[in-house]
């Protein structure tokens, strides 16, 4: 996963912000407010990130939700911008720091990786990680 971000940066040195996403595999994550969902355009540019299920399939379309992994590749310029810029309105509402870039028109390129991850945001998440580790050790 890290190698994919590094490779992308080397192939596209002009990109200031790189981030990673992966398909959501567990249905519960779609509605979980601890799982950040990402919508990109056809060129893998970030359009929006939310704790809500996005995009919303109004007509029941079958879609693949993508989740934010939080592995960033930032240029020095992007890092300095982030450190000096005020938290934005949507960033405060959603509590997602990448929205600071979105609201300030700084493009985020998302690299899709095949990585099953478990977010640890609440004490009850620890049991899920322990179960996954135990299962992996038993293989």
What role is predicted for each listed range?
Residues 1-85:
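Conserved core of the sugar-phosphate nucleotidyltransferase
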Residues 58, 63-139:
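Conserved alpha/beta core of the MobA/IspD/sugar-nucleotide pyrophosphorylase nucleotidyltransferase superfamily
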């Amino acid at each position: 996963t890290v190698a994919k971000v590094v490779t992308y940066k080397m192939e596209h040195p002009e990109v200031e912000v790189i981030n990673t996403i992966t398909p959501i595999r567990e249905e519960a994550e779609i509605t979980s407010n601890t799982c950040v969902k990402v919508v990109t355009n056809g060129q893998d540019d970030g359009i929006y990130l939310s704790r809500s299920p996005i995009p919303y399939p109004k007509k029941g379309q079958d879609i693949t939700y993508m989740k934010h992994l939080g592995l960033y590749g930032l240029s020095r310029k992007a890092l300095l911008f982030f450190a000096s810029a005020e938290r934005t309105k949507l960033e405060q509402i959603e509590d997602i720091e990448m929205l600071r870039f979105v609201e300030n028109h700084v493009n985020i390129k998302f690299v899709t990786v095949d990585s099953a991850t478990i977010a640890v945001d609440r004490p009850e998440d620890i049991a899920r990680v322990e179960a996954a580790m135990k299962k992996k050790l038993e293989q």
